Amino acid sequence: MEKVTIRDFLKKKEKKEKIIMLTAYDYPSAKIISQTNLDGILVGDSLGMVVLGKENTLKVTMRDMLIHLDAVVKAKPPQLIVADMPFLSYETSIKDAVKNAGLLARHGADAVKLEGGEEMRDVVRAIVRAGIPVMGHIGLTPQRFLRIGGYRILGKREKEEEQLLKDAKTLEEAGAFSIVIENTYSDVAKKITESISIPTICIGAGPYCDGQILVIHDLLGLSDFTPYFAKKYIDLRGLIRRAIEDYISEVKEGKFPGKEHYKSRDS
């Protein structure tokens, strides 16, 4: 598989081929993904909750992102690697935004993702001008859950729908190469997808986007809580628990280690 670029994402929209992404936060996951036909990897700030046990994404730092991005990059996946810009790494000033986006790019990100719509126009434009591709993120934006009164579906009110459409068009005009649409109504996501020329990637926004993304822990059944919009393709949590219980039993019963697992001088 050849290295995936942002041009491949744009071509897929033109050809009406689905773009498929997953999150990854470590070397083993990225190595496995590298052996699949997945299009893109998001090193997401969701790592704060699913890997580091934090309450929300607000507590994820640039240091956290760089450590996990480094681990993914070392697996050398051919997929497009997109890195999330964590909370307060791009909101305080355009200068900080470009500097932090550049830091992620230097550590191997092919693109960066940031949350927000119309209000992020100048930030997106500046990062793109610096030569770094930007993926937008609208709808439910977890870094702003306090402002919207918690984690809720957006787009029910006409005003919210109009703002989402405006946000998408503004991000496209600012130079974003694609947009994640999270937790909105499927008909709203469809309208957005049909109104812009760059790809839309859905998570909890229905089947009409140009692509889909899931948190890998949800897909594998490793999460404490699986949101309604995610599908658990395997119960890896249960398999791991059973493997650990088998290990405990075999050690107690003297079955492990077996002769094949150690060296004896008299053998």
Curated annotation (Swiss-Prot):
Residues where Mg(2+) binds: 45, 84, 115
Residues bound to 3-methyl-2-oxobutanoate are 45-46, 84, 113
Which controlled-vocabulary keywords does the entry list?
Answer: Coenzyme A biosynthesis, Cytoplasm, Magnesium, Metal-binding, Transferase
Q: Which Pfam families match?
A: Pantoate_transf
Instruction: State its Enzyme Commission number(s).
Output: 2.1.2.11
Q: What function does the entry list?
A: Catalyzes the reversible reaction in which hydroxymethyl group from 5,10-methylenetetrahydrofolate is transferred onto alpha-ketoisovalerate to form ketopantoate.
Q: What is this protein called?
A: 3-methyl-2-oxobutanoate hydroxymethyltransferase
